[in-house]
């Protein structure tokens, strides 16, 4: 018998087999409770925007300029300048952004956390962040990691002679990883033919993904699945960059501009490289990819496995990238690490060595670089940029600014003296308020007019929800401000029931015009404000019908955007393909409807209780799109009761599938078999899922009516104001 002592802490909290291991298909409510105050070390009254305003940004930039050329022995700078490394760091911080759901991007400084800190494509960026630590330490809470990573990329460009378009701070840090779907693969860089491939059919990339392989930011620089075919690579580039909100011109500018600087690293075999940061030994203190090849750094560094320097001036802005791209013919070769790359035929050695000034190399390129020459559309743009360097510089400056600010939302969130004055269409601009706002007396009068207009509670609530619920907490886009629900493309979305929406908006516009025409002091109400106010009036009336007097908070200040201020193509990605709050599915998806509800709730920054109370309220207010009966578990539609929960939890009702795919269910009286209700997966999950049932029981209790109404109003008000950054 063994006498070895047993560890008394073998069963520590969080260890062992998890619920997810036992029931992998169970919906994940944890995504609704990320980034709470429980994980935030800052004081409760800490306001990052105010802290950033106290920052001496010029001093930070001076320190960053000095850092660029202060090479450290533990990680030496290529060519004596860290610019290329820091550009890559900033690019990869922002480059995870994808337009399909707005997730990823530079906001929050997620590059510090798993899995991003350990993606193969982010190899050795841990060193870049450690180089920055003395500056972050010096300025502390006045600049977030999220802002510092992007600022450093900007300063890197400026220190090498490039004039940037501008810079905005305003990205508060997060303190734990986002819960983002990055793909189903279980192996880093798994090829497209793998068992969990993100591709189907004719290389159709799964939504909402944008990168071509697990662990890459964009595309495989060697070509699709490592196949060195520049034309095939162009297809991947175009698809991936489009999914990251970039058109062809922006794509060419970004690739060529970024590859004007620095180099890649592939001095030796990948077998010499140790584990990534999350798998590295404790004593490495969060650093990964420790290499045993030579010195493991400097001339011996291994990152991507590619060994390419694009220009003869890797620490200075130039047009060399295009000069080399078009001046040479290219032959396929391999890096010292064995990766596919290209070298200029019959070329002189004009490229400096990163560490030995006596050495020169022939120009080299990546497969994805050559795509800019051999794809017909990219070639036209590349040649124009080659012939017109000023156009190239302007395009790169604008594309870099877009890349690094795309997930920040409206300009009202931009902070600092370097914010550019120019308003850009992709920022979803709205006009500034240029008139007196309505007061409490006006608000009461407008509510009365709306309620007397003939519009139903359902119409008022549905329209306000449709307007506000486009908001995405991921990239801060959408929301009620701008009243874009009256513009293309939103006015034509199926989920908004265009014909009924047009009639509602026409009525509300009549109320708005009558009010504005009656004013003598310039006071006006915008349609954006009136839509939200009308929704508040509907909720108050529905609560009154239930015997509960309540006032829905309302803060005027929204304005109406024009069609010219609206990028129809960019706005189209906000169209809901699923909105469980309205019991809407555009089509059948592999992902269950209840999981899509949770995903929508997470984009709306809702907690599980807020999601629960909103669904229960929306059902009894009759806001369904499609079948008006599913989930409307009440005999009093239009009345804000807790009937949804009471009737869902009633054990006298037996539920059975009513469709072959188990998407619709019938609830029948257990004793008589009489049909009482019909519901969807979204409805029934509140009785099936143990956590959601616990919440439903709170609102389904006999003493819950008052609490239900007040909680609904609070959650409703939150959604209506998600885009009101001016109120924060």
UniProtKB/Swiss-Prot annotation:
Q: EC number(s) on record?
A: 1.11.1.21
Q: Which CDD domains does the record associate with it?
A: catalase_peroxidase_1, catalase_peroxidase_2
Q: How is it modified after translation?
A: Formation of the three residue Trp-Tyr-Met cross-link is important for the catalase, but not the peroxidase activity of the enzyme.
Q: Where is this cross-link: Tryptophyl-tyrosyl-methioninium (Trp-Tyr) (with M-244)?
A: 91-218
- Keyword Heme in annotation: yes
Q: Which PROSITE patterns match?
A: PEROXIDASE_1, PEROXIDASE_2, PEROXIDASE_4
Note on cofactor: Binds 1 heme b (iron(II)-protoporphyrin IX) group per dimer.
- Please give the catalytic activity noted in the UniProt record: H2O2 + AH2 = A + 2 H2O; 2 H2O2 = O2 + 2 H2O
Give any Gene Ontology cellular component: cytosol
What's a GO biological-process term for it?
A: hydrogen peroxide catabolic process
InterPro entries to which the protein is assigned, alphabetical: Catalase_peroxidase, Haem_peroxidase, Haem_peroxidase_sf, Peroxidases_AS, Peroxidases_heam-ligand_BS
Tell whether Heme is among the UniProt keywords: yes
Which residues does UniProt mark as catalytic? 92
Which residue positions hold the site described Transition state stabilizer? 88
Q: Which SUPFAM superfamilies match?
A: Heme-dependent peroxidases (SSF48113)
Q: Name one GO molecular function term.
A: heme binding
Q: Which cofactor does it need?
A: heme b
Arranged from A to Z, the UniProt key words for this protein are: Heme, Hydrogen peroxide, Iron, Metal-binding, Oxidoreductase, Peroxidase
Which sites bind heme b?
A: 259
Q: Which HAMAP family match?
A: Catal_peroxid (MF_01961)
Q: How does it assemble?
A: Homodimer or homotetramer.
Give the protein family.
Answer: Belongs to the peroxidase family. Peroxidase/catalase subfamily.
Protein known as? Catalase-peroxidase
The opening ranks of the lineage are: Bacteria, Pseudomonadati, Pseudomonadota, Betaproteobacteria, Burkholderiales
């Amino acid at each position: 018998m063994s006498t070895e002592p047993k560890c008394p802490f073998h069963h520590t909290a969080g260890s062992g087999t998890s619920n997810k291991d036992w029931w992998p298909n169970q919906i994940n409510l944890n995504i609704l409770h990320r980034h709470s105050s429980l994980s935030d070390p800052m004081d409760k009254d800490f306001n990052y925007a105010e802290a950033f305003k106290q920052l001496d940004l010029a001093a930070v930039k001076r320190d960053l300029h000095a850092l660029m050329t202060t090479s450290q022995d533990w990680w030496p700078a290529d060519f004596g300048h860290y610019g290329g490394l820091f550009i890559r760091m900033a690019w990869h911080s922002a480059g995870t952004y994808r337009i399909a759901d707005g997730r990823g991007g530079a906001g929050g400084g997620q590059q510090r956390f798993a899995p991003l800190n350990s993606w193969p494509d982010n190899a050795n960026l841990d060193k870049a962040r450690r180089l920055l630590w003395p500056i972050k330490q010096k300025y502390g809470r006045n600049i977030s990691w999220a802002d510092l990573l992007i600022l450093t990329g900007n300063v890197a460009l400026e220190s090498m002679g490039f004039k940037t378009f501008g810079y905005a701070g305003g990205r508060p840090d997060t303190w734990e990883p986002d819960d983002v779907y990055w793909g189903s693969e279980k192996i880093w860089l798994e090829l497209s033919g793998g068992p969990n491939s993100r591709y189907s059919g004719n290389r159709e990339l799964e939504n909402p993904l944008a990168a071509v392989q697990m662990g890459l930011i964009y595309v495989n620089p060697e070509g699709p699945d490592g196949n060195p075919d520049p034309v095939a690579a162009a297809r991947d580039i175009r698809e991936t960059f489009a999914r990251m909100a970039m058109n062809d011109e922006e794509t060419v500018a970004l690739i060529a501009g970024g590859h004007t600087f620095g180099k890649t690293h592939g001095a030796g075999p990948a077998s010499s490289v140790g584990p990534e940061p999350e798998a590295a030994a404790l004593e490495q203190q969060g650093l990964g990819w420790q290499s045993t090849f030579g010195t493991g750094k400097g001339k011996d560094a291994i990152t991507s496995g590619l060994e390419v320097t694009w220009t003869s001036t890797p620490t200075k802005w130039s047009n060399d990238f295009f000069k080399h791209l078009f001046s040479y013919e290219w032959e396929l070769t391999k890096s010292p690490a064995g990766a596919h790359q290209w070298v200029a035929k019959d070329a002189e050695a004009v490229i400096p060595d990163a560490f030995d000034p006596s050495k020169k190399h022939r120009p080299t390129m990546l497969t994805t670089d050559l795509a800019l020459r051999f794809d017909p559309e990219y070639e036209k743009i590349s040649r124009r940029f080659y012939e017109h360097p000023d156009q190239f510089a302007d395009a790169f400056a604008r594309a870099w600014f877009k890349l690094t600010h795309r997930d920040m939302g409206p300009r009202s969130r931009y902070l600092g003296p370097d914010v550019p004055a120019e308003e850009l269409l992709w920022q979803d601009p709205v006009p500034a308020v240029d008139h007196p706002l309505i007061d409490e007396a006006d608000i009461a009068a407008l509510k009365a007019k709306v309620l007397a207009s003939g519009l139903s509670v359902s119409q008022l609530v549905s329209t306000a929800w449709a307007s506000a619920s486009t908001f995405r907490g991921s990239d801060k886009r959408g929301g009620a401000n701008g009243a874009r629900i009256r513009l293309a493309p939103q006015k034509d979305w199926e989920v908004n029931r265009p014909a009924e929406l047009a009639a509602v908006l026409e009525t509300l516009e009549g109320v708005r015009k009558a009010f504005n025409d009656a004013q003598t002091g310039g006071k006006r109400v915008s349609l954006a404000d009136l839509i939200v106010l009308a929704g508040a009036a509907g909720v108050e009336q529905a609560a009154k019908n239930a015997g509960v007097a309540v006032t829905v908070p309302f803060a005027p200040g929204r304005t109406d955007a024009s069609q010219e201020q609206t990028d129809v193509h960019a706005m189209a990605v906000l169209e809901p393909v699923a909105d469980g709050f309205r019991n809407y599915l555009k089509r059948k998806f592999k992902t269950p409807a209840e999981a899509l509800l949770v995903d929508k709730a997470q984009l709306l920054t809702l907690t599980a209780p807020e999601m629960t109370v909103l669904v229960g309220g929306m059902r009894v207010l009759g806001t369904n799109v499609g079948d008006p009966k599913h989930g409307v578990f009440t005999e009093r539609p239009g009345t804000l009761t807790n009937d949804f929960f009471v009737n869902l939890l009633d054990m006298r009702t037996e539920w059975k599938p009513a469709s072959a795919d188990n998407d619709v269910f019938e609830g029948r009286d257990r004793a008589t078999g009489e049909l009482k209700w019909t519901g969807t997966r979204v409805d029934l999950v509140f009785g099936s899922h143990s956590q959601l049932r616990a919440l439903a029981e709170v609102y389904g209790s006999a003493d819950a009516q008052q609490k239900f109404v007040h909680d609904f109003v609070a959650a409703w008000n939150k959604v209506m104001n998600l885009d009101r950054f001016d109120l924060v």
